[in-house]
């Protein structure tokens, strides 16, 4: 996703880590901000999602199975200043629903997938994520459904929203308010105890931090990993050194 040219694109991997030139999917995502790929229409291939800030749009692009993509299929144009998009099953019906974070209206929202890629109107989860930058979903309380995480920059907040298993969400549960200019949130098991801990990147304090999950969705104070990720914008974790634990990556 690239903002200055409004572009959603992909790059073909030949299987050995060599990539093609840019393959354009769309140039109609006005100030494209985020992209994600997952099967949306339950046909076994991975479709593409985008969030674009200037047109307040969440959209998807249908993969025909041979990596040919349709024109944009608009899910919503009411995510004002859309900054983040993610998809996962939220209501327990086996298909992937869509989540958005939008900066201008401080909103975390989701869109119910009927299983074939048709979506409901916007379902608001919260309008108190002030300057919402990032949204993610994973099981945080060990009950088998996917809860929601948000990072919001105006209030420096990392928060989560409890899923009851049917796509009904609690009010925000604050994890921390010390991520100054919170820009990105992610979750994965970091301490090897089987539950998903939370990571944040914050732009104003150049910080990468994590929050220890006790297993039922109660979190520690922030544990600082670094304050030298200058203007930190993104965080992710995966095993990089083959020792079986998840290491942390940052972009600044």
Regions found by a protein language model. Give the residues of each.
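Low-complexity/repetitive intrinsically disordered segments
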Residues: 1-16, 230-232, 236-252
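Acidic/hydrophobic-patterned starts of short beta strands in beta-sheet-rich repeat architectures
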Residues: 1-2, 42-51, 92-101, 142-151, ...
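A short loop-to-beta-strand structural motif that recurs across blades of beta-propeller domains
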Residues: 7-11, 57-61, 107-111, 157-161, ...
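Blade-edge motifs of beta-propeller repeat domains
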Residues: 12-30, 62-80, 112-130, 162-180, ...
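Beta-propeller blade termini
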Residues: 33-42, 83-90, 133-140, 183-190, ...
């Amino acid at each position: 996703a690239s903002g200055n040219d409004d572009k959603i694109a992909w790059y073909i991997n030949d299987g050995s880590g060599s990539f093609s030139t840019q393959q354009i999917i769309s140039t109609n995502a006005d100030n494209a901000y985020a992209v994600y790929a997952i099967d949306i229409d339950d046909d076994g291939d991975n479709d593409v999602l985008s969030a674009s800030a200037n047109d307040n749009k969440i959209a998807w692009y249908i993969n025909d199975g041979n990596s040919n993509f349709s024109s944009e299929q608009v899910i919503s144009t009411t995510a004002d200043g859309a900054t983040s998009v993610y998809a996962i099953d939220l209501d327990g019906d086996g298909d992937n629903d869509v989540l958005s974070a939008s900066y201008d209206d401080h909103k975390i929202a989701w869109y119910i997938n009927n299983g074939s890629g048709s979506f409901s109107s916007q379902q608001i989860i919260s309008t108190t994520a002030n300057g919402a930058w990032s949204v993610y979903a994973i099981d945080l309380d060990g009950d088998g459904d996917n809860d929601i995480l948000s990072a919001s920059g105006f209030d420096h907040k990392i928060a989560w929203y409890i899923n009851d298993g049917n796509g009904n969400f609690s009010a925000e549960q604050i994890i921390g308010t010390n991520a100054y200019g919170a820009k990105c949130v992610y979750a994965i098991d970091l301490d090897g105890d089987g539950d998903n801990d939370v990571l944040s990147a914050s732009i104003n304090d150049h910080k990468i931090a994590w929050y220890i999950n006790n297993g039922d969705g109660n979190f520690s104070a922030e544990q600082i990993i670094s304050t030298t990720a200058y203007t930190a914008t993104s965080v992710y974790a995966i095993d990089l050194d083959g020792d079986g634990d998840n290491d942390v990556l940052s972009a600044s």
